[in-house]
Amino acid sequence: MADTVVVLGTWASPYSNRARIALLEKGVEYEYKEEDLVNKSPLLLKFNPVHKKIPVLIHNERPICESLIIVQYIDETWNKTSPLMPGDPYERANARFWADYIDNKAPECLSSFCEFKRIKTLFESRLSSEALIWRNL
């Protein structure tokens, strides 16, 4: 029986893309199902009932959740080609450290960047309004 591999994710999610890239690196064929995060599918709710979030890797009807855990699972399951992690335990731990660091800091940085852009837009709008007032005096 051939393996069935399904990834539940969204195109814009770096976490979904992490899982998909790992599968591509390993040469694993899979079916991709785009999720609507506002109206979560019964499939997502069935296979990730705890967190109800993406990505989810479904391998032979068994779900694996959380992108770093999915990548580790992919590396261990399809271990005949292209290791995703270094062979040396220290280097592997180091790679996991940086992956975890990025997972924890990236959303924070993105949030700060979006807030900066929002404030900048408000500030520029106010400057434009004030300049218009001064021109009309």
Give the positions of each predicted feature.
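GST-like domain detector, emphasizing the conserved glutathione-binding G-site
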Residues: 1-134
